[in-house]
């Protein structure tokens, strides 16, 4: 009986190793510093900058200029 339990335990440990299960520290929500330094962030993406520039600098009351939101938040008006 003990040898059957030993074989079963060995098989279970080989098929489902404990280190393969995700731990709490492996979750992205637990690592905010790494999320903030992500190279794929939307602020650094070239398409995001183009949308901001198009929305901010080209649509200001029919003339080329920056809206109030863009003056406060956008790179197109010189604020970083």
Curated annotation (Swiss-Prot):
Recorded GO MF terms: ion channel inhibitor activity; sodium channel regulator activity; toxin activity
Keyword annotations from UniProtKB, A to Z? Amidation, Cleavage on pair of basic residues, Disulfide bond, Ion channel impairing toxin, Neurotoxin, Secreted, Signal, Toxin, Voltage-gated sodium channel impairing toxin
In terms of Pfam families, this protein maps to:
Conotoxin
Q: Which residues cross the membrane?
A: none
GO cellular component terms attached to this protein's record: extracellular region
State the source organism's domain of life.
Eukaryota
Q: Where in the cell is it found?
A: Secreted
Q: Which parts of the sequence carry Cysteine amide?
A: 77
Organ and tissue specificity: Expressed by the venom duct.
Which region is the signal sequence? 1-22
Q: List the disulfide bonds.
A: 56-70, 57-76, 66-77
Q: What is its main location?
A: secreted
Q: Which positions does the propeptide occupy? A: 23-51
Role of this protein: Mu-conotoxins block voltage-gated sodium channels. Extremely potent inhibitor of Nav1.4/SCN4A (96% inhibition at 1 uM). The inhibition is very slowly reversible.
Q: Relay the record's extra comment.
A: The analog R2-Midi BuIIIC is a potent inhibitor of Nav1.2/SCN2A (IC(50)=34.1 nM). It also inhibits Nav1.3/SCN3A (10% inhibition at 75 nM), Nav1.4/SCN4A (45% inhibition at 75 nM), Nav1.6/SCN8A (45% inhibition at 75 nM), but does not inhibit Nav1.5/SCN5A and Nav1.8/SCN10A (75 nM tested). The inhibition is slowly reversible.
Give the record's family classification: Belongs to the conotoxin M superfamily.
Quote the entry's note on domains.
The cysteine framework is III (CC-C-C-CC).
What is the protein name given in its UniProt record?
Mu-conotoxin BuIIIC
* UniProt source species: Conus bullatus
């Amino acid at each position: 009986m003990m040898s059957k339990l030993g074989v079963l335990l060995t098989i279970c440990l080989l098929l489902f190793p404990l280190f393969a299960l995700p731990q709490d520290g492996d979750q992205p929500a637990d690592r905010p510093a790494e999320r903030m330094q992500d190279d794929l962030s939307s602020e650094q993406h070239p398409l995001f900058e183009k949308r901001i520039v198009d929305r901010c600098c080209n649509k200001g009351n029919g003339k080329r200029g920056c809206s109030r939101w863009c003056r406060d938040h956008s790179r197109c008006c010189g604020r970083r």
